Every structure is written in C-alpha cells, then in structure tokens.
C-alpha cells in the first residue's frame, strides 16, 4: 500500500492508494492537548460519493470528495474540463486504479450506457 501526504495538508493527513485517509500524530504545543494518529472515516454525501472532513492548521474544517483527493494526491490537479470516473461504477471504490479522468460528455455517455433506465425515464418524463 502506498501513502502520500494530501496536497495542502502536508504533515496533517495522508491518503493511501486504496483511498484510506489517516491523520498524523500532532504533539501538544502548549501542554494541553495532543492529537493521536487515527483513521479518518468518510461519510456518504447522499449521492453515493464518499466525502471526508479535513481540518487545516488554522482549525478550519472543510469537506472534500475522497475520489478527488486520491486522484490529485497520486496524479495531478484535475483540469476544470475533466471529471473523475469510477471504472467499476462503484462510487465508494476509490482505489487509484479504479479512477480515470473523462470529459463531462464521456462521463454522461458512460452513465447512460450503464444505466439505460435513466434515459428511458427521461424520455417518459419529457413526453
């Protein structure tokens, strides 16, 4: 299993090529509280994608899509014209080998080919 620091959160969090996020141990600076290293559990956002809360060094917490963190950590920033696709169509499988960049058109075409009932429902709704 490979791990790398998450871009923008170096020294705070790292992610594996399997899509697992952990925090680093952070010692106390004032003797009051230290933070142990621990696995950060993702949550489902309601559309099937996993998200994760990360807190920066200033204490500000933000939500991030796990598949985007994995891709950008092990590859490069995602261009605005591209989207991440899960090759096996399982939105919770965020292993780096299961992620690929597609255009919006390619991603929608794949979704409709894998889910023909969606297109039929749209046709029935419009007509």
Q: Predicted regions: what is each one?
A:
Residues 1-84, 90-127:
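Conserved recognition-core residues within compact binding domains
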